[in-house]
């Protein structure tokens, strides 16, 4: 029989309290758009602040139109983004063109702002192979559908950038559910061991489809999981674009200076369903919770901040919305005009030099498609 110790070896309360204090939520703008952390204000010009707002407004319009197009049967798979604009757009706003983006399936907006033509984003939703072909000058992979798998890929891409002497980072995104996957831990551990220039963004929107974050992990925060991998972790108000930008900009600077990766947890909320494939949020979250997070809308918050500085107006936002709708209209027209994909198209892009057995199949399908 094991002997009992007179005193606990580990003071669990002290340990957990220390972790909680270490990962307090970083915020610059409160829900009213007021600056509550002047010392942390990022060095952005007025034009840059307006551009950040323009991109967020465009992304909200894109989400609304994409939902409408999906309901019309003109788009296929779609994961709504409303509510997560600060977490998505402000992180990307801190990047440079040479940085490498590895998105999840909800992160198409970041790809668009990184250079993916909008019409190709629509083709991706339709399952057309052209939607997965990044232009040569766009450093990115197409959205990862396997939850969390992009974390391992990001560690590898980041290490490659380091070995090539590039002053660039690899950044990836997942939700809170992705942080429960084994690939998540492998990715941050590998990146930490090799001090790879990576940024891991976990958009904690509170639900892994329908599973609340409290039932996914006993950890007080997702950010604290960085400690086990020996990397920096930070929890950010994911509805505050300035806080999200500042945290990402600092993480990027640290990475390119050889100080290793960062795990950023953004506290955010998706206003819509998990995807447009039949998910009903009313089955697993209350109206009270939805109302609480609607009061934290990143666009409302940032709009108030900019209006207070005299940098934004209703007229200016209306113009952005009008331009966005027209750009989306033209992009969907271009997507509609894309030739229907054929089996031979898919076979052509599989190998640089087609194997003999596929050459035979290629000829068979070529004849079928010519009829």
Swiss-Prot record:
Keywords: Oxidoreductase, Pyruvate, Thiamine pyrophosphate
Top-rank EC class of the record's enzyme: oxidoreductase
Classification via Gene3D superfamilies: 3.40.50.970
InterPro entries the record matches: Alpha-ketoacid_DH_E1_comp (IPR050771), DH_E1 (IPR001017), PdhA/BkdA (IPR017596), THDP-binding (IPR029061)
Disulfide bond keyword on record: no
Reactions that this protein is recorded to catalyse: N(6)-[(R)-lipoyl]-L-lysyl-[protein] + pyruvate + H(+) = N(6)-[(R)-S(8)-acetyldihydrolipoyl]-L-lysyl-[protein] + CO2
Functional description taken from the UniProt entry: The pyruvate dehydrogenase complex catalyzes the overall conversion of pyruvate to acetyl-CoA and CO(2). It contains multiple copies of three enzymatic components: pyruvate dehydrogenase (E1), dihydrolipoamide acetyltransferase (E2) and lipoamide dehydrogenase (E3). The B.subtilis PDH complex also possesses branched-chain 2-oxoacid dehydrogenase (BCDH) activity.
Record NCBIfam families: PDH_E1_alph_x
Protein known as: Pyruvate dehydrogenase E1 component subunit alpha
Organism in which the protein naturally occurs: Bacillus subtilis (strain 168)
């Amino acid at each position: 029989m094991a002997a009992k110790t007179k005193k606990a070896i580990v003071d669990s309360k002290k340990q957990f309290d220390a972790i909680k204090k270490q990962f307090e939520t970083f915020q610059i703008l409160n829900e009213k758009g007021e600056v509550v952390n002047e010392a942390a204000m990022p060095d952005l010009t007025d034009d840059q602040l307006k551009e950040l707002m323009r991109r967020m407004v465009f992304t909200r319009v894109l989400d609304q139109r994409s939902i409408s197009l999906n309901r019309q049967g003109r788009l296929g798979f779609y994961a709504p983004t409303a509510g997560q604009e600060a977490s998505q757009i402000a992180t990307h706003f801190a990047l440079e063109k040479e940085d490498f983006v590895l998105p999840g399936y909800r992160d198409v907006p970041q790809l668009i702002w990184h250079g993916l033509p909008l019409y190709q984003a629509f083709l991706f939703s339709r399952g057309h192979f052209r939607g997965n072909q990044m232009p040569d000058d766009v450093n990115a992979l197409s959205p990862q559908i396997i939850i969390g798998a992009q974390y391992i890929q990001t560690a590898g891409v980041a290490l490659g950038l380091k070995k090539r002497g590039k002053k660039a980072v690899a950044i990836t995104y997942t939700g809170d559910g992705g942080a429960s996957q084994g690939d998540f831990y492998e990715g941050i551990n590998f990146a930490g061991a090799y001090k790879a220039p990576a940024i891991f963004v976990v958009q904690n929107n509170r639900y892994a489809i329908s599973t609340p974050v409290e039932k996914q992990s006993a950890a007080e925060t997702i950010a604290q999981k960085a400690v086990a991998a020996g990397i920096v972790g930070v929890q950010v108000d994911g509805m505050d674009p300035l806080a999200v930008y500042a945290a990402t900009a600092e993480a990027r600077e640290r990475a390119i200076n050889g100080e290793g990766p960062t795990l950023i947890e953004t506290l955010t909320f998706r206003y819509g369903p998990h995807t447009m494939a039949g998910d009903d949020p009313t089955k697993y979250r209350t109206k009270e919770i939805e109302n609480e997070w609607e009061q934290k809308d990143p666009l409302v918050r940032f709009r108030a901040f900019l209006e207070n500085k005299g940098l934004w107006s209703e007229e200016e936002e209306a113009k952005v919305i009008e331009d966005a709708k027209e750009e989306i209209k033209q992009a969907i027209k271009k997507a509609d005009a894309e030739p229907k994909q054929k089996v031979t198209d898919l076979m052509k892009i599989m190998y640089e030099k087609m194997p003999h057995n596929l050459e035979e199949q290629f000829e068979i399908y070529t004849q079928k498609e010519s009829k």
